[in-house]
């Protein structure tokens, strides 16, 4: 658990520095568990994300763009009514718990000044956002309701008194002394990191393991010294926001994690750190839920076509025996005088072989020798004719597999909007039936929205995240001399640089984006082709997003999320 009480302490300090006194100009709720405040503070506009997501609960300033629903949810409307236009007086933490309290001064409908408290409880699947009347300590409403039958200790319903979750009887690390540490830790019992978590509030196993590691040979001298030093780093706001990667797994924290042997990357702020760490994670989780049926359908269709090819290849194998059937027919015709009806096989010399071996030809005893010869000629003709048909069916099935591979890749990096476009594409392709509900008007066709990036040198880079977007970008948006990029022989996004002569750095940055939004996202040294749009063609009758191209150059890049985040325009 990286977002522990100590991290909450650090984030509370950071937000007070950045947005205290700021005005909440807009409130949005893009997703079920996430609320965004647009805040004007310290002379600039900032976005604050409050998330009660069961897996990704957090609070931080964000630079990410969020798509809002056409109709705001009820909780969003309630927040707009009570705190939109209000000022954030201060932000505090409940003890060292993972609870942040926003004090917001606003005015009600008749112009009277009001003070609201917004509690953000960062507690995993029990996370919540609760608005209260500060004067009465009464709940106005919560993102999630908690009835007495669900929790006997506290109720989260409108009109009920707000009650903090039960406090744990632990020592505050920020006030702890060496005596406190020695009094509560038993060096004989072992598992010192667990003891630290059990006795000190706001401390996670990650923090405790770091303390034990810094103590070296942990004893009554070294461990208190290491703990007090870490407590002081937090108390004095000497943060080193970082993400450390060990064997592909990422850990974030506000202090350096020397006990983890991996690659560490530092950030300017805790908010920037969380923006990077959670980039795409929560959205991918939402997409996974929305696209479960689509993913299952696409994978099944791919599997069907793969099985179809296996069967067709067996048919082709049989068809390729056509020459043998022809040989049998000719040899039987040449030896009719030796055969009679009722024979089960014929022993004949193969005159077409230089060594003239004797071969055995199976016969149908119910047929005359001439009828047996004709049966083999019929088999030969049928097999010969079927080869072309079977080969064409294999080609079509292979095209289907490539198409579904492309969709699988697109689903892996899709946004909720992308999902609906992929669904529409499958409906238009007659793969799925339309989900038209009773009384629902058919939506007018709309142009896809493309993701926009800006290179270090200021050039615009556009990205298609699904076949509809790819086709729209490549065939309608891009100019003839714009630069088009795509991973070489790997399913991925179409990427366009809006320039005829981009600098080398822009080409490499656009190639990195193309590799990131491809099936080779987790690979290194990925080949990316680039050419001018004039050299990119869509064959007649090709599936959406399929193109051919020539006159290309190839660069090799390693996909990098940090580059993608840095270049994305919010």
Swiss-Prot record:
Pfam families: NFACT-R_1, NFACT_N
Cellular component GO terms held in the UniProt record: RQC complex
Induction: Expressed during exponential growth, decreases in stationary phase. Transcription is down-regulated by AbrB and DegU in logarithmic and stationary phase respectively.
GO molecular function: ribosomal large subunit binding; rRNA binding; tRNA binding
InterPro entries hit by this protein: NFACT_RNA-bd, RQC_Subunit_NEMF, RqcH_bacterial
BP-aspect Gene Ontology terms: cell adhesion; rescue of stalled ribosome
Keyword Protein biosynthesis: yes
Observed phenotype of the null mutant: Bacteria no longer adhere to fibronectin or collagen, decreased biofilm formation. Bacteria no longer inhibit binding of other bacteria to fibronectin.
Keywords, alphabetical: Cell adhesion, Protein biosynthesis, RNA-binding, rRNA-binding, tRNA-binding
Keyword Glycosyltransferase: no
Function: Key component of the ribosome quality control system (RQC), a ribosome-associated complex that mediates the extraction of incompletely synthesized nascent chains from stalled ribosomes and their subsequent degradation. RqcH recruits Ala-charged tRNA, and with RqcP directs the elongation of stalled nascent chains on 50S ribosomal subunits, leading to non-templated C-terminal alanine extensions (Ala tail). The Ala tail promotes nascent chain degradation. May add between 1 and at least 8 Ala residues. Binds to stalled 50S ribosomal subunits.
Family note: Belongs to the NEMF family.
Record note on quaternary structure: Associates with stalled 50S ribosomal subunits, binds to RqcP.
Protein known as: Rqc2 homolog RqcH
UniProt organism field: Bacillus subtilis subsp. natto (strain BEST195)
């Amino acid at each position: 658990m990286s977002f522990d009480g100590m991290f909450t302490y650090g984030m509370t300090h950071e937000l007070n520095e950045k947005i205290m006194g700021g005005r909440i100009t807009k409130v949005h709720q893009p997703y079920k568990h996430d609320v965004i405040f647009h805040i004007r503070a310290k002379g600039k506009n900032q976005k604050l994300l409050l998330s009660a997501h069961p897996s990704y609960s957090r609070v931080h300033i964000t630079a990410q763009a969020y798509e809002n629903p056409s109709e705001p949810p009820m909780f969003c409307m309630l927040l707009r009514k009570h705190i939109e236009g209000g000022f954030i007086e201060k932000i505090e933490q409940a003890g060292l718990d993972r609870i942040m309290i926003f004090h917001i001064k606003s005015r009600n409908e008749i112009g009277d000044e009001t003070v609201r408290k917004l509690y953000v409880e960062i507690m995993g699947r029990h996370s919540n956002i609760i608005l209260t009347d500060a004067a009465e300590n009464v709940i106005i409403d919560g993102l999630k309701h908690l009835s007495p039958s669900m929790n006997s200790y506290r109720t989260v319903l409108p009109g009920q008194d707000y009650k903090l979750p039960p406090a744990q009887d632990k020592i505050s690390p920020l006030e702890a002394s060496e005596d406190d540490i020695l009094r509560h830790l038993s060096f004989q019992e072992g598992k010192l990191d667990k003891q630290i978590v059990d006795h000190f509030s706001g401390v996670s196993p990650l923090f405790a393991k770091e303390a034990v590691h810094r103590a070296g040979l942990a004893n009554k001298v070294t461990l208190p010294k290491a703990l007090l030093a870490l407590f002081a780093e937090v108390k004095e706001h000497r943060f080193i926001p970082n993400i450390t990667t060990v064997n592909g797994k990422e850990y974030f924290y506000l202090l350096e994690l020397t006990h983890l042997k991996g690659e560490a990357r530092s950030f300017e702020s805790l908010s920037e750190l969380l923006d990077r760490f959670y980039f795409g994670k929560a959205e991918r989780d939402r997409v996974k839920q929305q696209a479960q049926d689509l993913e299952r359908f696409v994978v099944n269709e791919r599997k069907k076509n793969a099985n179809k090819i296996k069967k067709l290849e067996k048919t082709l194998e049989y068809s390729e025996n056509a020459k043998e059937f022809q040989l049998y027919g000719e040899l039987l015709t040449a030896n009719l005088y030796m055969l009679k009806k009722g024979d089960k096989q014929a022993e004949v010399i193969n005159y077409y072989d230089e060594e003239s071996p004797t071969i055995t030809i199976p016969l149908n005893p119910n047929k005359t020798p001439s009828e047996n010869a004709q049966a083999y000629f019929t088999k030969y003709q049928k097999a010969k004719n079927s080869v072309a048909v079977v080969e064409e069916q294999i080609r079509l099935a292979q095209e289907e597999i490539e198409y579904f591979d492309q969709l699988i890749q697109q689903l892996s990096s899709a946004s909720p909007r992308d999902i609906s476009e992929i669904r529409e594409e499958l409906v238009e392709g007659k793969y799925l039936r339309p989900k038209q509900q009773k009384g629902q008007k058919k939506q007018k066709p709309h142009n896809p929205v493309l993701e926009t990036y800006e290179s270090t040198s200021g050039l615009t880079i556009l990205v298609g995240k699904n076949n509809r977007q790819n086709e729209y970008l490549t065939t309608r948006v891009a100019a003839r001399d714009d630069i088009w990029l795509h991973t070489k022989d790997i399913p991925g996004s179409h990427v366009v640089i809006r320039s005829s002569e981009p600098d080398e750095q822009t080409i490499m940055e656009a190639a990195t984006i193309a590799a990131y939004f491809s099936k080779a996202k987790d690979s290194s040294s990925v080949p990316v082709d680039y050419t001018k749009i004039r050299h990119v063609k869509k064959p007649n009758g090709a599936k959406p997003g399929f193109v051919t191209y020539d006159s290309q150059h190839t660069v090799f890049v390693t996909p990098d999320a940090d580059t993608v985040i840095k270049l994305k325009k919010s």
